[in-house]
From Swiss-Prot:
Entry GO MF terms: FMN binding; isopentenyl-diphosphate delta-isomerase activity; magnesium ion binding; NADPH binding; oxidoreductase activity
Cofactor requirements of the protein: FMN; NADPH; Mg(2+)
Protein name listed in UniProt: Isopentenyl-diphosphate delta-isomerase
Binding site for FMN: 62-64, 93, 122, 184, 214, 258-259, 280-281
Location in the cell: Cytoplasm
């Protein structure tokens, strides 16, 4: 019951704390193209994460599950949205269902609603090879997310305090998994060094989960008697983290998440190097406050607006969007300069 209570508290505080931190996309500006030689009707948005083909670069990221009927109902509605728009969808951490079998349905509902969709299983980096297999089998997943959440765990009153051996555990899962493994952050971003470490052990896809979206340090601090407020502003902003990851020149697929709310955010993330973008808190707030039909409408508008932006930039598809020129300025430019990353590549291509 304690785990179920925590899952429900996470939803409550995620909704109440909002997205108050900047993701850095305000520092990214496209170079206007007066002669784009493009047509809205010819713009397509298909993309790939590794070997997985997606009809959209937008997908529903891991949010919940394991909190009884309420989380089952949330996942059910999100699955209907995913099915309606042919979006990939990730479930929240399934460790709750591995510990408490009565919670299995709160995750399995996603596959029941969307039997032919692309669904991602999800576990923390403490997971074993056997637990990873069980999580994938539970929802007949097409891929497995392994989330890295050191700051959240440290801030969580009942969280983990020992993070030794994480890279080796992930490597073991990668070597034995029958589905692709996506390693993701949860709002604190990934550095180029972390990305390189993951590439070295055979990880083929990452979700940088940058600073700017749901603040899990703030969420966990709401549950503490003594706040660890120094973690509330911890992390690498989403825009900077995408560029850090891209600078490693690896072949791994890059997913951008962390405060993404608009089609312009999506376009900028892809132009910086992402193959796909993931929405969590923004979609959850619409679902909880305005309902499933409104969320379905919002996703439709996101796709329309993304195609408008791509038309303006002369990009007929996602690969062409990844090559349009843009300028990096402000705090993001200064961060990347200090990190030894040359942003001229983006403005001169």
């Amino acid at each position: 019951m304690a785990r179920e209570k925590r899952k429900l508290e996470h939803i409550e505080y995620a909704l109440s704390t909002g997205q108050s931190r900047t993701h850095g996309f305000c520092d990214i500006e496209f170079v206007h193209k007066s002669l784009p030689n493009s047509s809205f009707e010819s713009v397509t948005c298909e993309t790939k994460i590794g070997e997985l083909s997606l009809s959209s670069p937008i997908f529903i990221n891991a949010m919940t599950g394991g909190g009884g009927e309420r989380t089952l109902h949330i996942n059910e509605q999100l699955a209907y949205v995913a099915k309606h728009h042919h979006l990939a969808m990730a479930v929240g951490s399934q460790m709750a269902a591995l510990k408490e079998k009565r919670e299995v349905d709160s995750y399995r509902i996603v596959r029941r609603v969307n039997p032919n969709g692309i669904v991602f299983a999800n576990l923390g980096s403490e997971a074993t090879v056997e637990q990873a297999k069980c999580a994938v089998d539970m929802i007949e997943a097409n891929a497995l997310q392994i989330h890295l959440n050191v700051i959240q765990e440290l801030t969580m009153p009942e969280g983990d305090r020992d993070f030794k051996g994480v890279l080796k555990r992930i490597e073991n899962i990668v070597l034995t998994s029958e589905v692709p493994v996506i390693v993701k952050e949860v709002g604190f971003g990934m550095s180029k060094e972390t990305v390189q470490q993951l590439a070295n052990i055979g990880v083929t896809a990452i979700d940088i989960g940058g600073q700017g979206g749901t603040n899990f340090a703030a969420v966990e601090n709401e549950r503490r008697n003594r706040m660890l407020s120094y973690f509330n502003d911890w992390g690498i902003q989403t825009a900077s983290s995408i560029i850090e990851a891209s600078s490693t020149n690896n072949t791994l697929s890059l997913i951008a998440s962390g405060g993404i709310q608009t089609a312009l955010d999506v376009a900028k993330a892809i132009a910086l190097g992402a193959q796909a973008t993931a929405f969590a808190g923004y979609f959850l707030r619409i679902l909880m406050n305005e309902g499933m039909d409104t969320l379905i409408e919002e996703v439709e508008l996101l796709h329309t607006d993304l195609r408008f932006i791509m038309t303006a930039l002369g990009a007929k598809n996602i690969l062409e969007l990844q090559q349009v020129p843009l300028v990096v300025k402000g705090d993001t430019y200064h961060w990347l300069t200090q990190r030894g990353i040359d942003t001229m590549y983006y403005s001169q291509r």
